[in-house]
Amino acid sequence: MSESRRTLLDCAIIFFVTCLLIAPLFRADILIQWDSIESTFIADARLLRDHLPHPAWQPLWYCGTRFDYIYPPALRYGTALISLLAGISTARAYHMYTGVLYALGIAGVYWLAYAGSRSRAQAWLAAIFTALLSPTLLLIPIFRLDSTDWGPQRLHVLMRYGEGPHISALSILGFALAASYLALRKWRPAVLVLSGVLCAAVVANNFYGATALAMFFSILIWAVWLEVRQPVVWLRALGIAALAYGLCAFWLTPSYMRITSLNLHWVAEPSKPSSVAIAICCAAVFCAATFAAAKRQAVTAWPVFLVGASAFTSIFVLGRYYFGLAILGDATRLTPELDLAWILLAAWGLVTAWKRRWLRPLVAVLLCAACYPVVPYLAHRRLPFRRAHDIPDRPEFQVTRWLAGNLPGARAMPSGSIRFWYNAWYDDAQSDGGSSQGMLNQMLPIAHWQITKGERADLAIGWLEALGVDAVIVPGKTSKEVYHEYSYPEKFQGTLLEIYNDHMGNIIYRVPRRFPAIARVVEHGALVAAETPRDGADRERLMRYVSAVENGPDSPVKVKWTGFDDIDVEAAISPGQALLVQETFDPAWQAKADGKRLAIQHDAFGFMLIAAPPGAHTIHLHFETPLENRIGWFITGITCLVAAILLARAKKLRDALYC
């Protein structure tokens, strides 16, 4: 059997054995982890499945935001299409998508280890360790307490915390690095294209996976260059990066990066300049030390890469845990990547040590010791896949069903796990959402904090009215809702009208808005004079804005969504008045009345204020595909053409991958 076929056979065996190990995942629908963020990915995929092919605007989350801003496209489209084509729920489709990639990811570790070492023993050890072990549990006690079955962290965070996009990206990462290693060492056009495609797939699944890719890819370039000492290595690396970006350009726009960076402080601790400086110094020391070693004697790329990958993931994760380093995002979420780096290094070290007879007893002892945590994991291997059987009794389902049936089209404010699951079954609008990094309106976190944490009902009601919210969902202390975000859930009692009470701790209150629609005819001068509140407790500015919105002209407005990207508004406007639409402003929104384009500006709360002419009009608003996305599609098309030309000129891909 040829080497390439043997490698493919090994990968196939690893994939199918891993599938057997996680078999319940492929049959799973909704699991018992009601606090898991996988709910938001399930909800997002359901929305996409029901509104294919590609809505440009997402009106149901965050008082409206760009659909592309919510999350990278791979998992959401993969889940939606599996659900649509297989005729299954998006929850089960999500678990199938993540399960298949998880199993492929273990095979990807094999291919990465084999590509780097040309040792099947190393590759098998790395794959087995990845499927069964988590070295980080030895050094991080809180993770050990959180993972009582001692299972691998990549599976634990997938099932316990819903890190589906992250682990899917990590699963592809092994293949991407293996292809990159081969493409950097020798001119192989087909492998270079494959590397670019796989790197793009990592980024298109998750940004923590992309962070790991950026780190590992940089170390890999350096390691390969130290071995071959050819400047062309850097050109090949640039080609891979260009291909990867080009394939992502249609969604990875400049504004996407800006919004994601802007919102990072809502979901992670900001980077510390001192921590970044430490990381840069460590990188400089690593480069200097390895360069000096390479000048004295020839070095091999693979061990240099392993040492670098292990060192820098340790600086990120262990540095965050033990020394409080904040380099980029929440570094502790890179624990599965740290496991990967350490496992690859351990497999290399054990195989290298085995070649020395006097070290073989030590290797045997270490392998036996590694079996210890495997026993509890295998004994409880089905524990992470427990299905929920109480869905009809859960507030996450009951509340959303009631609102869909009794207040269709209304914007509500859920919280906690109800917020996570709010759109898993119905197209109900909420002022919050499930992916804060995609939030366009920066007033929302201030408002939601005051509503849930503040003691004063009048301030909370003012914020609800300002956001165009018709109903607020308040889980009390006895609710089955998981997070209980309200510090004073009783503050609305006797102040707001109670319209739903399940007598199990979940109450829905009606917000006293003048008209139910998200649009208002307002006095232009009064609304323009309203200022943005300085903070959540700035009652003066808040109520001045609310007064301009709710106490304006007695002119009801009819609002009809004709799709996620289109709104028809019927309004009668008098001189000196304007139309307020409580949907987040974006320059890509266009308004027309009687065939004429109308100017749109944002108000103090980030909503759309339209300069409508006097008279009765039907004003049509349409969210156009932004110019940067159209340019991105052009770049992606050119990239695909270049990739096709490279593939056409390449030899057989199968032979190139293993030479």
Give, region by region, the residue ranges found by the protein language model.
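Start-transfer (signal-anchor) and selected internal transmembrane alpha helices
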Residues: 1-25, 124, 365, 638-659
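Active-site-proximal, structured, solvent-exposed surfaces of multi-pass membrane proteins
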Residues: 3, 540-658
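Membrane-interface helix-loop-helix junctions at transmembrane boundaries of multi-pass membrane enzymes
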Residues: 3-5, 187, 227-239, 287-314, ...
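Active-site lumenal/periplasmic loops and adjacent helix-entry segments of GT-C-fold
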Residues: 7, 20-180, 201-211, 382-391, ...
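Extracytoplasmic
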Residues: 47-52, 85, 107, 167, ...
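Short hydrophobic alpha-helices at membrane interfaces in multi-pass membrane enzymes
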Residues: 179-200, 230-239, 361
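Perimembrane helix-loop-helix junctions
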Residues: 212-242
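Signature aromatic-anchored transmembrane alpha helix within multi-pass, membrane-resident enzymes
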Residues: 242-245, 350-376, 659
